[in-house]
């Protein structure tokens, strides 16, 4: 398992992971919002600071996108959920941004326990996502190793 910086050629695999992970963990999205968010994400991801998790065969199995101290996105291929790739990506982000923050979906059942297990604490939230859609967010900030 290793981490490397993403390059433009990695974006298509990252989008594939995003789509698979979103389908597996964001069943609450309406079909219309899923299509809308997909288009927005596909337009945004090529400009993001992208970090990739690679398996033992050097295949990309997850990614994390950063914007300063903010973890903007973290998605792992559902086929390898629970194998430590997400944790490795977040720990890498914390080496670059020790005061990292993240906005996690309240409805994604695995997101909040995952971040809290790594030392993130709740600092607030909103009733909608950043585009005003009815998907509540929980704001978290890294408070140190639990």
Residue ranges and their predicted role:
Residues 15-41:
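Conserved GNAT-fold acetyl-CoA-binding loop/helix
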Residues 48-62:
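Conserved beta-hairpin
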Residues 70-81, 105:
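A short, internal acetyl-CoA/4′-phosphopantetheine-binding micro-motif in the GNAT/acyltransferase core
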Residues 95-108:
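Conserved GNAT acetyl-CoA-binding A-motif
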Residues 41-52, 70, 133:
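A short helix-loop-beta-strand connector motif used in the catalytic cores of GNAT acetyltransferases and
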Residues 80, 84-92:
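Conserved acetyl-CoA pyrophosphate-binding loop and the N-cap/start of the following alpha-helix
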Residues 87-88, 107-125, 131-134:
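Conserved active-site alpha-helix within GNAT-family acetyltransferase domains
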Residues 2-16:
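A short beta-loop-alpha structural element at the N-terminal edge
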């Amino acid at each position: 398992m290793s981490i490397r910086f993403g390059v433009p050629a990695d974006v298509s695999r990252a989008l594939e992971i995003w789509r698979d992970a979103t389908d597996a963990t964001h069943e609450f999205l309406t079909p219309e919002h899923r299509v809308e968010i997909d288009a927005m994400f596909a337009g945004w991801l090529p400009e993001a600071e992208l970090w990739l998790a690679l398996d033992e065969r050097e295949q990309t199995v997850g990614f994390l996108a950063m914007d300063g101290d903010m973890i903007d996105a973290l998605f792992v291929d559902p086929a390898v959920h629970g194998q430590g790739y997400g944790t490795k990506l977040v720990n890498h982000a914390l080496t670059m941004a020790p005061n990292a923050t993240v906005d996690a979906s309240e409805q994604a059942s695995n997101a909040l326990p995952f971040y809290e297990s790594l030392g993130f604490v709740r600092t607030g939230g909103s009733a909608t996502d950043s585009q005003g859609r009815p998907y509540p967010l929980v704001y978290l900030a890294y408070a140190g190793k639990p």
